[in-house]
UniProtKB/Swiss-Prot annotation:
One of its GO terms (biological process) is mRNA transport. Asymmetrically arginine dimethylated at one site by host PRMT6. Methylation impairs the RNA-binding activity and export of viral RNA from the nucleus to the cytoplasm. This is Protein Rev. The gene is rev. Residues 26-50, 82-107 are annotated as: Disordered. It comes from the Viruses. It is found in: Host nucleus, Host nucleolus; Host cytoplasm. It holds the Pfam family REV. HIV-1 lineages are divided in three main groups, M (for Major), O (for Outlier), and N (for New, or Non-M, Non-O). The vast majority of strains found worldwide belong to the group M. Group O seems to be endemic to and largely confined to Cameroon and neighboring countries in West Central Africa, where these viruses represent a small minority of HIV-1 strains. The group N is represented by a limited number of isolates from Cameroonian persons. The group M is further subdivided in 9 clades or subtypes (A to D, F to H, J and K). Escorts unspliced or incompletely spliced viral pre-mRNAs (late transcripts) out of the nucleus of infected cells. These pre-mRNAs carry a recognition sequence called Rev responsive element (RRE) located in the env gene, that is not present in fully spliced viral mRNAs (early transcripts). This function is essential since most viral proteins are translated from unspliced or partially spliced pre-mRNAs which cannot exit the nucleus by the pathway used by fully processed cellular mRNAs. Rev itself is translated from a fully spliced mRNA that readily exits the nucleus. Residues 36-50 have a biased composition (Basic residues). GO terms for cellular component: host cell cytoplasm; host cell nucleolus. Belongs to the HIV-1 REV protein family. The lineage of its organism: Viruses, Riboviria, Pararnavirae, Artverviricota, Revtraviricetes. The keyword Transport applies.
């Protein structure tokens, strides 16, 4: 895979194989029995699926070495932040230059 070393490729492939085995070990329940029995089997199946999903996330985060969540948005330095209550356009939260401002729609 591009941008990765061979060792991490093998570790990633091994993690994917483990996750695949986990999901294959929990097949969807068979549609037989009473309505209540089927409902209980589906409920237990969904609970196992949630557990498998959380285990899979832990395996991947350990293997890849980064959290599954995206990196938080980087804000500009605190000195450049201000509260602007005007209705003019521009990026909110950052100071705009005080030069010529063109207003659309004003005569």
């Amino acid at each position: 895979m591009a941008g990765r070393s061979g060792d991490s490729d093998e570790a990633l492939l091994q993690a994917v194989r483990i996750i695949k085995i986990l999901y294959q070990s929990n097949p969807y329940p068979k549609p037989e029995g009473t309505r209540q029995a089927r409902r209980n089997r589906r409920r237990r199946w969904r609970a196992r699926q949630r557990q498998i999903h959380s285990i899979s996330e832990r395996i991947l985060s350990t293997c890849v070495g980064r959290p599954a969540e995206p990196v938080p948005f980087q804000l500009p330095p605190i000195e450049r932040l201000n509260i602007n209550c005007s209705e003019s356009g521009g990026t909110s939260g950052t100071q705009q230059p005080q030069g010529n401002t063109e207003r659309v729609g004003n005569p």
